[in-house]
């Protein structure tokens, strides 16, 4: 897009959202009636340079006949004023899998059970349907999609459709090819009518599971776990880069030649350089990631060709042990293991890493049930003798050399995320990915200034005290020199509730009242 076109679009965007218009005034609340069905994953924020400019919501607004529904795409500005109201009719068997916003367009990935197609629809911000991309799916792929729909609850965040700046969107979906389970990457342009699909053809392994990590202007970066057997065998972790221009794999790294191997968890472009930053737990070369425990947290700098130019290792027992009580298995006292949610780089070159704890505990109910089943000569395949508990938030600070210089634990209420037999046998990494997939972590989002000079890390919690008993929304706020905490009590009779980032110092709360068929929105000040 040319500089002139960018200026023109931003001018229209600002005028459309009422950011310079005196006719639109800030309001604290908004209600929308006749909402027959609302899914929280069908909603999102509209932002520019890291600042909230509005919101979008897609919901079922009417029933036309026994085969057809009416759907509404509602666009609001940052003060909850209605900006656009787009209605369309489509199949009753239309289900929205994911949605995303990329700065200039909103994308929706639908599964149409009538036509047996996956449909990507891309709208601009004046409500015009720019492009529709469709492709058929078969029964084998549909079985995987049904598992996906079951696992992704309304409380879950976007998992499989991601923005690539103003150029377009990318989706990463499971696929079955005969007995082989693999994945496919679909790219959808929002600038021109262009779409392409990448399916790995050179993987010898029968099972490959891909997770999107991030992107650059020219790369889609994935973590891919590969193995030869569904129920056994040690998976190997690969960092895979797909070139957007050539539509081919640019690199596939498994670090097998190193003394340590990285399990990539987070990828972000390194500002001011063409390189990317990769962060994740690391293991000794001969460790099995499906069974063994990580040795610490590694930070790699990598070029877009896949060449690693810098490696820094921080051990759990040594480096992190100066600030947190950890053991050699990477387990923090009372917190457990860490999942990395966000990496924040500030103007003074500090690096803050947001983690959340999870751990395995004995499951009294599962033990009792297993004992009763065994006494009756039966095998328990439902309840685990252990359970997975999500614990506290952890804020870690690193210097410009990527060495840890501090870490603080922020207490929150432990909650049971998983109590089936899968918690008994799977590794810490597999469990962490599963918790992320089902939306079990309490981390919500990070918001702040465009340059990260000030930011707030937000998460949900549940308080049980004499003064208050119920859900809370919490913020760990950084003002450029120190951290403070804040929280909002979320008493509600709504069927479902979700908190969104909002303009500076506020959050936006959306509630769906299923019985009344009503969506309520309100802005609340932090503090």
Give the location of each predicted region.
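Bacterial Sec-dependent N-terminal signal peptides
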Residues: 1-31, 527
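Secretory-pathway ectodomains
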Residues: 27-527
């Amino acid at each position: 897009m040319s500089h002139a076109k960018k200026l023109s679009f931003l001018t229209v965007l600002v005028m459309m959202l009422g950011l310079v218009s005196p006719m639109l005034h800030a309001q604290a609340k908004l209600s929308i009636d006749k909402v027959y069905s609302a899914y929280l994953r069908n909603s999102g924020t509209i932002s520019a340079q890291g600042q909230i400019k509005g919101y979008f919501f897609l919901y079922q607004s009417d029933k036309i006949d026994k085969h057809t529904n009416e759907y509404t795409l509602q666009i609001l500005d940052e003060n909850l004023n209605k900006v656009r109201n787009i209605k369309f009719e489509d199949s009753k068997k239309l289900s929205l899998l994911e949605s995303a916003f990329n700065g200039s367009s909103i994308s929706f990935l639908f599964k149409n059970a009538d036509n047996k197609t996956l449909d990507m629809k891309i709208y601009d911000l004046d409500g015009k349907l720019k492009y529709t991309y469709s492709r058929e799916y078969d029964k084998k792929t549909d079985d995987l999609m049904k598992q996906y729909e079951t696992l992704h609850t309304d409380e879950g965040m976007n998992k499989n459709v991601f923005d690539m700046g103003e150029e377009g969107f990318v989706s990463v979906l499971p696929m079955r090819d005969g007995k082989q389970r693999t994945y496919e990457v679909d790219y959808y342009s929002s600038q021109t009518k262009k779409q392409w699909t990448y399916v790995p053809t050179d993987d010898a392994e029968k099972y490959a599971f891909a997770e999107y990590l991030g992107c650059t202007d020219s790369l889609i970066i994935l973590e891919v776990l590969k193995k030869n057997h569904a129920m056994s065998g040690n998976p190997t972790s690969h960092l895979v880069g797909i070139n957007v221009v050539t539509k081919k794999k640019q690199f596939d790294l498994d670090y097998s030649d190193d003394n340590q191997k990285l399990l990539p968890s987070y990828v972000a472009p390194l500002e001011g350089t063409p390189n990317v930053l990769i962060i994740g737990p690391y293991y000794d070369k001969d460790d099995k990631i499906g069974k063994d425990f990580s040795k610490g947290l590694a930070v790699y700098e990598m070029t877009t060709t896949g060449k690693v130019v810098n490696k820094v290792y921080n051990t759990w027992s040594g480096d992190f042990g100066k600030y947190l009580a950890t053991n050699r298995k990477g387990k923090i006292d009372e917190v457990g293991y860490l999942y990395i949610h966000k990496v924040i780089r500030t103007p003074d070159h500090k690096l803050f890493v947001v983690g959340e704890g999870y751990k395995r505990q004995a499951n009294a109910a599962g033990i009792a049930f297993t004992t009763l089943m065994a006494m009756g000569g039966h095998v328990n395949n439902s309840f685990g003798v252990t359970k997975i508990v999500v614990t506290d938030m952890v804020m870690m600070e690193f210097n410009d050399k990527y060495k840890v210089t501090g870490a603080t634990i922020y207490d929150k209420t432990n909650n049971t995320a998983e109590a089936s037999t899968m918690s008994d046998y799977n590794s810490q990494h597999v469990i962490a990915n599963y918790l992320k997939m089902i939306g079990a972590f309490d981390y919500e989002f990070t918001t702040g200034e465009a340059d990260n000079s000030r930011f707030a890390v937000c998460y949900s919690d549940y308080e049980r005290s004499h003064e208050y008993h119920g859900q809370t929304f919490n913020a760990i706020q950084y003002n450029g020199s120190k951290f403070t905490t804040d929280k909002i009590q979320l008493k509600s009779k709504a069927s479902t509730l979700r908190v969104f980032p909002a303009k500076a110092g506020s959050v936006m709360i959306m509630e769906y009242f299923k019985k009344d068929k009503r969506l309520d929105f309100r802005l609340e000040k932090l503090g």
